Design a protein with these regions (language model features):
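WD40-repeat beta-propellers
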Residues: 14-17, 55-59, 99-102, 140-143, ...
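A structural motif specific to WD40 beta-propellers
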Residues: 23-26, 66-69, 110-111, 151-152, ...
Length: 318
C-alpha cells in the first residue's frame, strides 16, 4: 500500500481511497463522534483519528475495524494531532486548552501543556525537540521539550484566533493563519540550541476565515484553505526581514475554485506537485497544482469532509 489517502468528517466514517481511481477501498465506522483530524504515522503503519474527546489509533494494514488503542485524557474536541518522526510519541491539541504528548505504544499521557484557552492546532518541529501550537486568543507558542517549558509566545494579532500552524520540513520557516484571513511568517534560526523567531512577512490571504495552513514538503509552496470556498497556493519567497518597510506578501500562484462550501483541510503529495482538499460539500478533491485542475473527486461521505491525510512517500525515500 504505497499511497495512503484517507478522509473523515461529520458522517462518523473514515474512508480510505485509491488515489488514482477514486474508489473507496475501505470504510471504518467512528460512532463516538465526528472526526476532526487524521494523521498517518511516518512508517505508514498507523492512522490516528482525532475526535471529540479521544484519539483512536488504527492499524492501516489490518482489516480489523476496531482501533488498536484509544487515547483518553482530553475533555474537549481534539483539534490537532502529529507523530514523532519515529512514531514513538504523538502530540495533540484540544479545545480543553491543553497540548498533550502521548506514548504511542501505551497510550499514556507523558506531558500536558496548558494554553489557558482552546488550542486549535499543533505541529512538531523537524528537530523533534520543540512543538508549536496555537490558540483561540491569538497566540502561537513554542514548547521546548528538553526544558519542558514554553520558550516563545507570539501574538500576531491580539484576540484574533490562530486557527492553524505549519513548520517547514527543513526547519527554516514557521507560518500561522488566523480567523481574520491573515498569514504570518517567521524565519526559524537555530542559535545555541535555542530557536529564534524572526518575523519575515504577513499578508491577507483570504477575506474569510483560514481553516488550514500548510507548507509543501519542498518548502516552495504554502497552501491556505478557507471558509471562502477556495484553497490558495502561495509561492514561498526568500524575503529578507525588512523592519522599515511594509512586508511583501508571498506571490499568489493559484486559487483552487470548484469547492461548493468551506474548505477545511489539505495535504500535499510527497513531490509537492499535487494537493488533496477536504470540503464541507462532502467531497475530497485531488488537484494538480501546475494546471490548477481537479484530477479526481472522492465521493462517498454523506456529510462534510473536514480532514484528510496523505502519505505517498516511497519506502526507499525514508
Amino acid at each position: 500500500m504505497s499511497v495512503i489517502l484517507c478522509t473523515a468528517g461529520y458522517d462518523h466514517t473514515i474512508r480510505f481511497w485509491e488515489a488514482l481511481s477514486g474508489i473507496c477501498s475501505r470504510t471504518i465506522q467512528h460512532p463516538d463522534s465526528q472526526v476532526n483530524r487524521l494523521c498517518i504515522s511516518p512508517d505508514k503503519r498507523f492512522l490516528a483519528a482525532a475526535g471529540h474527546h479521544t484519539v483512536k489509533l488504527y492499524d492501516i494494514k489490518s482489516t480489523n475495524p476496531n482501533p488498536l488503542l484509544t487515547f483518553e485524557g482530553h475533555t474537549g474536541n481534539i483539534t490537532g494531532v502529529a507523530f514523532h518522526c519515529e512514531g514513538k510519541w504523538m502530540v495533540t491539541s484540544s479545545e480543553d486548552g491543553t497540548v498533550k504528548i502521548w506514548e504511542t505504544r501505551s497510550g499514556q499521557v507523558q506531558r500536558s501543556y496548558n494554553h489557558g484557552c482552546p488550542a486549535n492546532d499543533v505541529v512538531i518541529h523537524p528537530n523533534q525537540g520543540e512543538i508549536i501550537s496555537c490558540d483561540r486568543q491569538g497566540s502561537v507558542r513554542v514548547w521546548d521539550l528538553a526544558e519542558n517549558n514554553c520558550s516563545h509566545q507570539l501574538i500576531p494579532e491580539e484576540d484574533v484566533s490562530v486557527s492553524s500552524v505549519t513548520v517547514a520540513s527543513d526547519g527554516s520557516l514557521l507560518c500561522a493563519a488566523n480567523n481574520g484571513g491573515n498569514v504570518f511568517v517567521w524565519q526559524l534560526l537555530q542559535a545555541y540550541d535555542r530557536t529564534q523567531l524572526v518575523p519575515v512577512t504577513h499578508f491577507n490571504a483570504h477575506k474569510e476565515y483560514i481553516t488550514r495552513i500548510l507548507l509543501s514538503p519542498d518548502v516552495k509552496k504554502l497552501a491556505t484553505c478557507s471558509a471562502d470556498h477556495t484553497a490558495r497556493i502561495w509561492e514561498v519567497k526568500d524575503l529578507e526581514p525588512a523592519p522599515d518597510q511594509e512586508p511583501k506578501p508571498f506571490p499568489l500562484e493559484a486559487t483552487l475554485t470548484g469547492h461548493q462550501r468551506w474548505v477545511w483541510d489539505c495535504a500535499f503529495s510527497a513531490d509537492s506537485a499535487y494537493l488533496v482538499t477536504a470540503c464541507s460539500d462532502h467531497y475530497a478533491r485531488l488537484w494538480e497544482l501546475h494546471s490548477q485542475q481537479i484530477i479526481r473527486q472522492y465521493n462517498g461521505h454523506h456529510r462534510g469532509a473536514v480532514c484528510v491525510a496523505l502519505n505517498d512517500y516511497s519506502e526507499s525515500a525514508r
